[in-house]
């Protein structure tokens, strides 16, 4: 690291934002190809490119923060603001889905039969798998808080145990959601109910997968002693994101599964 007279991180040119954008284009185009032409080739290419980008970008950030010491308190403050703004943007993103749902359900049109759920739709029982999913995510919220407090107290083993439990619960939630989709008596093409249900819960499921990936990276970093009790923003950001995913699910459960059924 060359001598510098300021606390800011002057980032080196990186190809990963470009490859990340290209992978996003390939994945969204691949999703359309899969839906309309039953071909997964483009989607698989997009997912592969995305995984490679994630690995290499995370590797660079770990190198800059842990080994080169670029993440000074000033830089960490900027990263905190960035993560907060990112979560706010995600809140607005999900607000759009809730808006679509309530716009359709509070005043059902004659085309829907003037009722909600629309005529012919058999909604899922909110007291079965959705309630179990709620319990799983609430438990994961407790375990991630346990992990955070263990890290701040310097208790490495408890932190690893709690983080592993959180990851396991996240994976379990994803499997439950997949089984629910498989057994659902309606599809994404079943009018406004199907589209709002699958888009809202599907994007939440995607965020659970992203959050689980974030936590898995933190787990391996903790195994390599990357975090200390006062320098662990990578884990803190993952914990914030996980709590956000928890809260969104509670709104989804109350709105779409319970009230909407």
Swiss-Prot record:
<keyword id="KW-0812">Transmembrane</keyword>
<keyword id="KW-0496">Mitochondrion</keyword>
<keyword id="KW-1278">Translocase</keyword>
<feature type="transmembrane region" description="Helical; Name=IV">
    <location>
        <begin position="129"/>
        <end position="152"/>
    </location>
</feature>
<feature type="transmembrane region" description="Helical; Name=I">
    <location>
        <begin position="16"/>
        <end position="34"/>
    </location>
</feature>
<protein>
    <recommendedName>
        <fullName>Cytochrome c oxidase subunit 3</fullName>
        <ecNumber>7.1.1.9</ecNumber>
    </recommendedName>
</protein>
<feature type="transmembrane region" description="Helical; Name=III">
    <location>
        <begin position="73"/>
        <end position="105"/>
    </location>
</feature>
<feature type="transmembrane region" description="Helical; Name=VII">
    <location>
        <begin position="233"/>
        <end position="256"/>
    </location>
</feature>
<dbReference type="GO" id="GO:0004129">
    <property type="term" value="F:cytochrome-c oxidase activity"/>
</dbReference>
<keyword id="KW-0472">Membrane</keyword>
<keyword id="KW-0999">Mitochondrion inner membrane</keyword>
<feature type="topological domain" description="Mitochondrial intermembrane">
    <location>
        <begin position="106"/>
        <end position="128"/>
    </location>
</feature>
<dbReference type="InterPro" id="IPR033945">
    <property type="entry name" value="Cyt_c_oxase_su3_dom"/>
</dbReference>
<dbReference type="Pfam" id="PF00510">
    <property type="entry name" value="COX3"/>
</dbReference>
<feature type="topological domain" description="Mitochondrial intermembrane">
    <location>
        <begin position="257"/>
        <end position="261"/>
    </location>
</feature>
<dbReference type="GO" id="GO:0005743">
    <property type="term" value="C:mitochondrial inner membrane"/>
</dbReference>
<dbReference type="GO" id="GO:0045277">
    <property type="term" value="C:respiratory chain complex IV"/>
</dbReference>
<feature type="transmembrane region" description="Helical; Name=II">
    <location>
        <begin position="41"/>
        <end position="66"/>
    </location>
</feature>
<comment type="subunit">
    <text>Component of the cytochrome c oxidase (complex IV, CIV), a multisubunit enzyme composed of 14 subunits. The complex is composed of a catalytic core of 3 subunits MT-CO1, MT-CO2 and MT-CO3, encoded in the mitochondrial DNA, and 11 supernumerary subunits COX4I, COX5A, COX5B, COX6A, COX6B, COX6C, COX7A, COX7B, COX7C, COX8 and NDUFA4, which are encoded in the nuclear genome.</text>
</comment>
<comment type="function">
    <text>Component of the cytochrome c oxidase, the last enzyme in the mitochondrial electron transport chain which drives oxidative phosphorylation. The respiratory chain contains 3 multisubunit complexes succinate dehydrogenase (complex II, CII), ubiquinol-cytochrome c oxidoreductase (cytochrome b-c1 complex, complex III, CIII) and cytochrome c oxidase (complex IV, CIV), that cooperate to transfer electrons derived from NADH and succinate to molecular oxygen, creating an electrochemical gradient over the inner membrane that drives transmembrane transport and the ATP synthase.</text>
</comment>
<feature type="topological domain" description="Mitochondrial matrix">
    <location>
        <begin position="1"/>
        <end position="15"/>
    </location>
</feature>
<dbReference type="InterPro" id="IPR035973">
    <property type="entry name" value="Cyt_c_oxidase_su3-like_sf"/>
</dbReference>
<feature type="topological domain" description="Mitochondrial matrix">
    <location>
        <begin position="67"/>
        <end position="72"/>
    </location>
</feature>
<dbReference type="InterPro" id="IPR000298">
    <property type="entry name" value="Cyt_c_oxidase-like_su3"/>
</dbReference>
<dbReference type="InterPro" id="IPR013833">
    <property type="entry name" value="Cyt_c_oxidase_su3_a-hlx"/>
</dbReference>
<dbReference type="GO" id="GO:0006123">
    <property type="term" value="P:mitochondrial electron transport, cytochrome c to oxygen"/>
</dbReference>
<feature type="topological domain" description="Mitochondrial matrix">
    <location>
        <begin position="153"/>
        <end position="155"/>
    </location>
</feature>
<dbReference type="GO" id="GO:0008535">
    <property type="term" value="P:respiratory chain complex IV assembly"/>
</dbReference>
<feature type="transmembrane region" description="Helical; Name=V">
    <location>
        <begin position="156"/>
        <end position="183"/>
    </location>
</feature>
<feature type="topological domain" description="Mitochondrial intermembrane">
    <location>
        <begin position="184"/>
        <end position="190"/>
    </location>
</feature>
<dbReference type="InterPro" id="IPR024791">
    <property type="entry name" value="Cyt_c/ubiquinol_Oxase_su3"/>
</dbReference>
<keyword id="KW-1133">Transmembrane helix</keyword>
<feature type="topological domain" description="Mitochondrial matrix">
    <location>
        <begin position="224"/>
        <end position="232"/>
    </location>
</feature>
<feature type="transmembrane region" description="Helical; Name=VI">
    <location>
        <begin position="191"/>
        <end position="223"/>
    </location>
</feature>
<comment type="similarity">
    <text>Belongs to the cytochrome c oxidase subunit 3 family.</text>
</comment>
<feature type="topological domain" description="Mitochondrial intermembrane">
    <location>
        <begin position="35"/>
        <end position="40"/>
    </location>
</feature>
């Amino acid at each position: 690291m060359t001598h510098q007279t300021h606390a800011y991180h002057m980032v080196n040119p990186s190809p990963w934002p470009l490859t990340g954008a290209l992978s996003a284009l390939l994945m969204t185009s691949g999703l359309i190809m899969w839906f309309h032409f039953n071909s997964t080739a483009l989607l698989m290419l997009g997912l592969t490119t995305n995984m490679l980008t994630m690995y290499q970008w995370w590797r660079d950030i770990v190198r800059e923060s842990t080994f080169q010491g670029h993440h000074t308190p000033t830089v960490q403050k900027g990263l905190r603001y960035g993560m907060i703004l990112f979560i706010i943007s995600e809140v607005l993103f999900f607000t759009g889905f809730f808006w679509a749902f309530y716009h359709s359900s509070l005043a059902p049109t004659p085309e829907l039969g003037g009722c909600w759920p629309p005529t012919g739709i058999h909604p899922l029982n909110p007291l079965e798998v959705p309630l179990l999913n709620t319990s799983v995510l609430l438990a994961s919220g407790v375990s991630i808080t346990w992990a955070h407090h263990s890290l701040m107290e310097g208790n490495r083993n408890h932190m690893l145990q709690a983080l592993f439990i959180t990851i396991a619960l996240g994976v379990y939630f994803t499997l439950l959601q997949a089984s629910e989709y498989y057994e659902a008596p309606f599809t994404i093409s079943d009018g406004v109910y199907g589209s709002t249900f699958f888009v809202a819960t599907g994007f939440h499921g995607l965020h659970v997968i992203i959050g689980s990936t974030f936590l898995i990276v933190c787990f391996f970093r903790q195994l390599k002693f990357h975090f200390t009790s006062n320098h662990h923003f990578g884990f803190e950001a993952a914990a914030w994101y996980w709590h956000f995913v928890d809260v969104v699910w509670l709104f989804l459960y109350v709105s779409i599964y319970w009230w909407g059924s």
